[in-house]
Curated annotation (Swiss-Prot):
<keyword id="KW-0813">Transport</keyword>
<dbReference type="InterPro" id="IPR006480">
    <property type="entry name" value="Phage_holin_4_1"/>
</dbReference>
<dbReference type="GO" id="GO:0140911">
    <property type="term" value="F:pore-forming activity"/>
</dbReference>
<feature type="transmembrane region" description="Helical">
    <location>
        <begin position="77"/>
        <end position="97"/>
    </location>
</feature>
<feature type="transmembrane region" description="Helical">
    <location>
        <begin position="111"/>
        <end position="131"/>
    </location>
</feature>
<feature type="transmembrane region" description="Helical">
    <location>
        <begin position="36"/>
        <end position="56"/>
    </location>
</feature>
<dbReference type="Pfam" id="PF05105">
    <property type="entry name" value="Phage_holin_4_1"/>
</dbReference>
<dbReference type="GO" id="GO:0005886">
    <property type="term" value="C:plasma membrane"/>
</dbReference>
<comment type="subunit">
    <text>Homomultimer.</text>
</comment>
<keyword id="KW-1133">Transmembrane helix</keyword>
<comment type="similarity">
    <text>Belongs to the bacteriophage holin family.</text>
</comment>
<keyword id="KW-1003">Cell membrane</keyword>
<protein>
    <recommendedName>
        <fullName>Holin-like protein TcdE</fullName>
    </recommendedName>
</protein>
<keyword id="KW-0812">Transmembrane</keyword>
<keyword id="KW-0472">Membrane</keyword>
<keyword id="KW-0653">Protein transport</keyword>
<dbReference type="GO" id="GO:0015031">
    <property type="term" value="P:protein transport"/>
</dbReference>
């Protein structure tokens, strides 16, 4: 048996097939540590959580159900990344065809797995949340960007009401 391989097949009279969870876990952790997009998801989630807590402290609006919902969403994002990284290890599917060539050239990508593709989507989502929390904390944000964030959030949530700020 090869402990470094996630699969073991016996070549005797019977063929045994099973997943060695330790091997899959080691490969997954190694995979996650090598991919910048996955590291960026964890970084943006952490930074957004910090800014969200600071925003709640500043506004004195601690809402445990809102915090729990946000925490569940962030844990689910990380769980999805772990799951999709296992899918990447097993399938080796390449999502580069979904990105414009300019982005591929700028990022110098040769391969984009499903976990990295969803990592990019999660990074974009968390980046909007970071900008929102920066505005709510009173940090300097360019006026045009702040207005666009307020309009976007007004259409999608009730967290930053753009009508109240005008």
């Amino acid at each position: 048996m090869h402990s470094s391989s996630p699969f073991y097949i016996s070549n005797g009279n019977k063929i045994f097939f099973y997943i060695n969870l330790g091997g899959v876990m080691n490969m997954t952790i190694s995979f996650l540590s090598e991919h910048i997009f996955i590291k960026l998801v964890i970084l943006t989630i952490s930074f957004d959580t910090l800014l969200g807590c600071l925003s709640a402290i500043k506004s004195r609006k601690f809402n445990s159900s809102f915090g729990i919902d946000g925490g569940i969403r962030k844990v689910a994002m990380i769980a999805c990344i772990f799951f999709l990284s296992v899918v990447d290890i097993l399938t080796k599917f390449n999502f580069l065809f979904m990105l414009p060539q300019d982005c591929i050239n700028f990022l110098r990508l040769k391969h984009l797995g499903i976990s990295e593709f969803f990592s990019i989507l999660f990074i974009l989502y968390e980046s909007v949340s970071i900008l929102k929390n920066m505005c709510l904390c009173g940090l300097p944000v360019p006026k045009r960007l702040k207005e666009k964030i307020a309009i976007l959030l007004d259409a999608m949530t009730d967290e930053m009401n753009a009508k109240d700020e005008k």
